[in-house]
Amino acid sequence: MPTAPPAVELAAPDIAPYAAGNTGIPYVTSFDSGRPGRHVLVNALAHGNELCGAITLDELFRRGIRPLAGKLTLCFANVAAYRRFDPASPTASRFVDEDFNRLWDAATLDGKRQSAELARARALRPLVDTVDLLLDLHSMQQASPPLMLAGLADKSLALARRVGVPEIIVRDAGHAAGARLRDYGGFADPASPKAALLVECGQHWERPTAELAMATAWRFLAAAGVLAPAEAARILAQPAKPQRVVAVTDAVTIANDRFEFTEDFRGLEVIARAGTVIAHDDGREIRTPYDDCVLIMPSRRLLRGQTAVRLGRFTA
């Protein structure tokens, strides 16, 4: 039986003051230091019901953040979905037509298919092509510990370690349903100097989720060289728990219309024995492939073609 969504403890900020931006793209603002350096992007609202990113960008604007070197861009991505957010029905505004974070490959962006999210992704693409370092702020359905999704490239793992939070780093290849923004172009290319991180800050509407998003953003900006050295050193010296790394080996993609887990998994459960049944996909048993298998982000959106859960193991 479906459970009621958690209480909404966060207030969706008014982002209308940022609509004009200064890039020619609505809701996208860039600050150029006039000095050589990297182009750093902090992205929020890939999904319209993930409030922590909007709260974080609103706070950065209010604090008058400016880069010491290079360029800093703050982007509210799926504004059309965000406008539909209703605390009385908080799960309904993830997207308008389709998932904004499954569109980021050349074939999809260059294709003929149309949707509200594709139109926005295509509008943002020229700017994203100029970005060197990306932090994409997200949150999760479940009340699960925060995760830093670093992809497979060593450069992004190194960046995640420099940021220092959250405690769990996940190395994964993404989803069969489509490419994420953090996997686009040079971000996922080991030969490119570009790097990207996607942080899942906690459950969508819990207060600590917004706090973690803000802390991660400040530490990312410090690690990226956006802040003055003394300020960056102060931020990065703040206590953080030792990080652990989960390497994802399998993504369970739903093949049929009747998929259900055997338990109410929330994420980061460690299943001791290989061969343990964790779900049924229209009668097909889904089993853990090895001992001490870690479940990453089990989904409540159990739809054909979508990722039900990722399976991994702790490597560090």
Say what each PLM segment does:
Residues 1-316:
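Structured catalytic-domain cores with a bias toward divalent-metal coordination
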